[in-house]
Each structure stands twice: as C-alpha cells, then as structure tokens.
Amino acid sequence: MHRYRSHTCGALRPSDVGSTVRLSGWCHRVRDHGGVLFIDLRDHYGLTQCVVDADSPAFRAAEAVRSEWVIRIDGRVRQRPAGTENPDLPTGAVEVYIADLEVLGHAVELPMPVFGDLDYPEETRLRYRFLDLRREKLHANIMKRGAIIDSLRRRMREGGFFEFQTPILTASSPEGARDFLVPSRLHPGKFYALPQAPQQFKQLTMIAGFDRYFQIAPCFRDEDARADRSPGEFYQLDIEMSFVTQEDVFQAVEPVLRGVFEEFADGWRVTQSFPRIPYAEAMLKYGVDKPDLRNPLLIVDVTEEFSAEAVTFNAFKNLIRAGGVVRAIPAPGAASQPRSFFDKLNDWARSEGAPGLGYIVFEEEGGQLIGRGPIAKFVPAEVQAAIAGKAGLKAGDAVFFSAGTEAKAAGLAGKARIRIGDDLGLSDKDQFAFCWITDFPMYEWNEDEKRIDFSHNPFSMPNYDHKAFLALDPADADTILGIKAFQYDIVCNGIELSSGAIRNHRPDVMEKAFAIAGYGRDVLEQKFGGMLNALRMGAPPHGGIAPGVDRIVMLLCHEPNIREVVLFPMNQRAEDLMMGAPSEVTAKQLRELHIRLNLPEKSA
C-alpha cells in the first residue's frame, strides 16, 4: 500500500464497502459522541467520515487529534447506519472504521477557522491566505479558475489560434497607467518595466507574419484596486488577428466566450448572439457604455417634451436653455409603491450629488391617462401623454427624470435605471447577458484645454475613408468630432470584460490622427518610434481584443470581488501581507543597482 493513501478523501463509494483503505488529509472536525469519535477527514478532493471507538487500537491516538492536524488513517470501509447518510457528500453513504492512525503534521491554534461561512477581516484572510484557501468555497473558486483557463485555451486552439509568450521585462510605456519599474544592474540608471499589456508585442507578432495569436498574459499596472480589478497584476486572454475586419474579431471571440460561459454557467442562460450597440445608443438608452442588459428598462430623451412652451417646470427649462438635457427612466408598476419608495429614490439621488429625481405617476381616470406627483402640475396633459408614449408607459406606471449636462443627466439616469430595476424586481439576474459596444468616437472636445483630443484608443483605425481622412482640415471640428473609430468593448452583466480595436496599421493615417489631436510628428517618433518603424516595413491590417480572465472567473463564480478568485491577492494598498511585500532591500543590493533612496519625510 502507498505510504500515504490508497484513495483520496472524495473517492469512496458503496462499492468500496469491505475494503481496507488508507487515507491522508486534514482533520476537518472532531466530534465526540460518548466514547465514539467521528473525524471528518478532508483533502483536496473531498471529505470522508471516519469513526473510531475504544475497541480500536487507534482510539488513544485519535483522542489527541485536533482540528487541522494532518493525519494518516488505515481502516475498513463500511456502510453508514440507516438514517445517518449525508446526501450532500459524494462519500456520504459510507464511513471508514479506523484501525491505525498516524499524525503527519500538528497544527497550533489557528487565527481563523477553515470551515463555515463566517466572514473574517480582509487583513486576517490575506495574511493567512493559505488557511483561507482551505475553505471550501474559495478552494472551489480557484479550481474553477484553472478549469476556465483550460477551456479558454482549448477553444482558442480549436479556433485556429496559436499560443505565444511575450517578454515580461520590457520598455516603459509613455502612455496608460503607471509602470512597475525594474532597475538594470548591467545598465546603471536604466530600467525595465513590467508590461501593462503585451500590446506592442502582439502587434509586432502580426507584422512578423504570424496570423492568429493568443496568450493567457500576465499584466502589471501600478494602479488602485477596485472590486473588479486587482492592484498590481492581472491576467487577460490576449488575442490578435491579421487580415481581419471588426466583424471577423467578433465572430472569432463570441464562440469562445459563449462556450466557456455555457460550460460553467451552473444553469444560467447565456446570450446566444451578442447584440451590437453603438456607443451613442448605449449612453442614451442605458446611461453607461457598459450596460447591464439583465435590466429591461430603457432610458429615453424627453428634452423636446420639456422644451414645450406650455411646460412651466422652470428647473428643467432653465437647464435646457443652458444646453442641458432631460432623460426619463420608466418605472413599470411603480404607481402601487408606497410614498417611501419615491422618497428613498430622491434621497439616493441627492447622495449622488443631484438635487433629486422628479417623477410622475400615471393613473387612469375616465379613460384618460392622468399624471400625479410633485412636477405633474407643471406639465400639461398632452406633454404627459407624449412622455408616456415615448417611454412606453401606461396606467399604474411611473417615470423618473434626470436633468443636467448630457454627461451628468446620462450618468444619473444610468444609475437610477439599475436601482429602479432592482427595487422593482425587474432584473432577470440568472443569466449572463453579453453585448458589444461599437462605434466609439475617435475624438472628443477637451474643455479644459479647449482643443480636440483622442476620446479612447489613439492607435485604433478611424472608421472613415482614408483619403478623405488624410485630407481633413484640423480646424473642421464638426467633421472631426463626428468620426467614429473601429473600437469596441465586450460587456457582460454591466462589467466591461475587454476593449479591443482594429489597429491603425498605416503610418500616414496614424501621423494624421495624432496631428488632428495636436501631436507633432516629432512627439510621435519620440514616444512610439519603434512601432512606427515596424509599421513602415509592411504591416498587415490587424486587430484584436483582450478579455480579462479574472473578471470572467469572477462572473462565473458569482463573486462580487475579484479577490475571491485570485490565488494570492494583494490588499487594497497593493501589499502582500503574507509574504511581506513590498519590502526594504539591503544596502548592498541598492549599491549593485546604483540606486540611492530619496524617501519623503515622515509627517510628525
């Protein structure tokens, strides 16, 4: 028999009854039932109930065992007594009567238990992450993560993609988030950077003549943590393709993501054909460029209706005269809600920095749709009817309003849409609702600097005739601000999984694109000369995307925080409490790197 085990703790079944087995694992729990000890033995694969009584030579040793000790037991498999089976365990029909027990590893009193759903402070969980990972749910999340990555790899290979590995030590990027810098011992005063993404390398791979690239790529950015973003490092499914249109990228990526989500959906529905939503439409209908389509509510613009001469609600009319807009958020069935429902929404809007949410409640009176509420008296019946018609409202429904600059009105309306949908129970949560956001503006007006600037990705291809683009007058702001880019986001349940683009592979178009935004050729050469040089040597049309692996896993594990799907995450301050990183280094190490510290003075 093997030194430590003949079976794992999740393997035994009724067919093993009568067998002599050896198991090793952690003592999950010990229960003393008056001279009979029950030890739940746990390993990576599962849990088995083991039993020992005073008739066994192992009883004395078993009495000393405590939680989380690591032990080996030999014993015989037997059927559990009728009525004591545990249907929630794969091994729940059997138990092992212990004949021999060996302690392989003792455990001191633990700073946190490893069973149950008790929530412990983040600092404790991260400092003792190896204990936290023994907890069933977190352990399962990490295993699911590995299975998801395996599935992604398999599906990419089936789609004709080849896996590459790009450098981890590279040059610092002049754009984007802050780099993590690595000093060079051989080149004093110079630094490598950890890649924020393999963006330039994957494009260079296409220029090198490869066709379909992918990589489960580690990425490093010195930025603050969020619920859906780890500080420091994360992984993405990095993808690039040659000789493709935007639609080709969609057709390659959709089956991969749809297939992975269907494989791990646990019964949730998955969007079969991802809708394409133009950016402007998303901002109007959902108030955000990453809409949660599980919520059926659609925002509508009612600026024209509130501009009517007969409307006397001056708070909105004054905003409209100043260039603002009014957005309406429907609330189906909300007329039956108590006054507190409306008051809470108004209080919430004030907490968001808005003066409140005006609203109208619709009722039927004499066959007519009649509006009630604090602003209804300022809005004539014909305008109320027009608003109701545009928003698809009927008697028993309500509508809320958000007004201000287009950005502020859209932002508040988008948040209100989610809140109202949740409060009214309208959102269908048991699904993964995907969409593509397309047609991002190439440029935007920088109000602070009074000039045109890039709106999103400066390296994407303009969705504009190239000859006409090269001939554009930089002073023709109206035309330029109307240009769209071949940029796209993929969104699931209101979470942006990735941005992507068809790349600008033509140096002349790239130079013109930067010139329109006020960047001279010298700036372009200085910051991006290496990439420009490669583009001048025969670059194919190419494009790609990079869905975030951590966010995919977070969604499929139904976790609200990305920390719950990362093996050894940092805390919110980018500290590894378990390993003590970041840490000070020795003076000798600093001398070898020709580095002298100039630390800020500590405040008194």
Curated annotation (Swiss-Prot):
One GO term (biological process): aspartyl-tRNA aminoacylation
Sample GO molecular function, one term: aspartate-tRNA ligase activity
Catalytic activity: tRNA(Asx) + L-aspartate + ATP = L-aspartyl-tRNA(Asx) + AMP + diphosphate
EC number(s) reported in the record: 6.1.1.23
Cellular localization per UniProt: Cytoplasm
Pfam families on file: GAD, tRNA-synt_2, tRNA_anti-codon
Record-linked PROSITE patterns: AA_TRNA_LIGASE_II (PS50862)
Binding sites annotated in the UniProt record for L-aspartate: 175, 221, 456, 503
GO cellular component, one term: cytoplasm
Top EC class, one word: ligase
InterPro entries (UniProt xref): Aa-tRNA-synt_II, aa-tRNA-synth_II, aa-tRNA-synth_II/BPL/LPL, Asp-tRNA-ligase_1, Asp-tRNA-ligase_1_N, Asp/Asn-tRNA-synth_IIb, AspRS_core, GAD-like_sf
Region (Aspartate): 199-202
Keywords: Aminoacyl-tRNA synthetase, ATP-binding, Cytoplasm, Ligase, Nucleotide-binding, Protein biosynthesis
Site (Important for tRNA non-discrimination): 33, 83
Record: residues binding ATP: 221-223, 496, 548-551
Primary location group: cytoplasm
Family statement: Belongs to the class-II aminoacyl-tRNA synthetase family. Type 1 subfamily.
Task performed by this protein: Aspartyl-tRNA synthetase with relaxed tRNA specificity since it is able to aspartylate not only its cognate tRNA(Asp) but also tRNA(Asn). Reaction proceeds in two steps: L-aspartate is first activated by ATP to form Asp-AMP and then transferred to the acceptor end of tRNA(Asp/Asn).
Subunit field text: Homodimer.
Protein name as catalogued: Aspartate--tRNA(Asp/Asn) ligase
Species classification: Bacteria, Pseudomonadati, Pseudomonadota, Alphaproteobacteria, Hyphomicrobiales
Gene name of this polypeptide: aspS
